[in-house]
Amino acid sequence: MAHGAKYRVPFRRRREGKTNFRLRLKLLLSRTPRLVARKSLNNIVAQIVEYDEVGDKIVVSAHSKEIVKLGYKGHCGNVPAAYLTGLLLGKKALKEGNEEAILDLGLNSATKGAAVLAILKGAVDAGMDIPHSEEILPGEDRINGSHVKEYAELLKVEDEEKYNKQFSKYLKNGLNPEDLPEHFEEIKEKILSL
């Protein structure tokens, strides 16, 4: 693997594709806690992290499974779930006394309307001070799940079998996908009342 005497082996986490150290250094030099937003296919994780020489210290954390405990019946990896997770994190952070942070997306790119940016919008709506641009955040129709509702209505008319397969978890949990925006508002009110 080495290419001569001057070859320098990259850091292990860089080789594994886990950490962008140039970006991490810029974030750490701000001396502000980071809002770490991560999304997998089925879950959302949001954390407020402070730098420590020994290792980063997680101050507050929220997981999309926590909104399920509050009664959320939808999919935990979509934009509405990301917003609710960010809102929950923001409420927890404010209770702990953390009012400001900067967004850390890791190796994710900041694509307009992405679910990781819905986490940011949720935290900002909870009352946190996080620098951002309004135009990159997802629209209100995507945050409350109206796009899911429209697709479900279209699919129910065109192909009932595909509708039942696509939204099987919603139906199993007792939620019609057409009712997602109302259900979203109900869970949002629960989180805001915490």
Curated annotation (Swiss-Prot):
Q: Quick check: keyword Lipoprotein in the entry?
A: no
Task: Report any Pfam family annotated for this entry.
Answer: Ribosomal_L5e
Give an example GO cellular component term for this record.
cytosolic large ribosomal subunit
RNA-binding recorded as keyword: yes
Per the record, the GO terms for biological process are: ribosomal large subunit assembly; translation
Q: Which InterPro entries match?
A: Rbsml_uL18_euk
Q: Which GO terms describe its molecular function?
A: 5S rRNA binding; structural constituent of ribosome
Keywords per UniProt: Ribonucleoprotein, Ribosomal protein, RNA-binding, rRNA-binding
Q: How does it assemble?
A: Part of the 50S ribosomal subunit. Contacts the 5S and 23S rRNAs.
User: What does this gene product do?
Assistant: This is one of the proteins that bind and probably mediate the attachment of the 5S RNA into the large ribosomal subunit, where it forms part of the central protuberance.
HAMAP family from the UniProt entry = Ribosomal_uL18_A
Q: Which family does it belong to?
A: Belongs to the universal ribosomal protein uL18 family.
Give the protein's recorded name: Large ribosomal subunit protein uL18
